[in-house]
Amino acid sequence: MRSFILKTCAFFKESQVETANVQRQLLRHTLATMAYRSAKSVRDAPESFGSFSSGDKGRTPAQILAHMGDLMDWGLSIAKGAQAWHDSTPLPWSQEVERYFAAVKAFDDYLAGDGPLAASPEKLFQGPIADALNHTGQINMLRRMAGCPVRSENYYRADISAGCVGADQSKPGREF
């Protein structure tokens, strides 16, 4: 009986580890999806786009991208168990783009490692990741309003894979 119990406990522990790995991989794929979409959002945008104003009280694209970078830094700090929020002052557009993708990479690198997650994958997704993904759409909308629209794409066909989180992404599968 003792042997059966030990084997059962080992199975469940292994099953829990497997589930945790699947969840981490899904988070990493979500970051890669966000990186793909946001790379498309910022690609070929003129430097002046960062300060574009829609005329209302909304944020500029540079302010949104700075916030997205802050969200990635925050997500990493939550994952490491030392939650810290910083409200960054936006850099010039091209520098802000670099900062954002560096923050996404740092978060992804941590998720790719074997360090413990101090928060559940669900909380990491529903907080910083989902928020940043939402802001990607805002940048797309502002691109159209600024007269430099982003072409639509069938994202289902996009070549997206975990770990590919930089500004250099694969070519679109099908734009329209």
Go through each PLM region and give its residues:
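Extracellular-facing binding/remodeling surfaces
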Residues: R43-F49, A106-Y110
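Surface-exposed, polar/charged faces of alpha-helical domains
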Residues: G113-P116
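Helix-adjacent hinge/juxtasegments
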Residues: A82-Y110
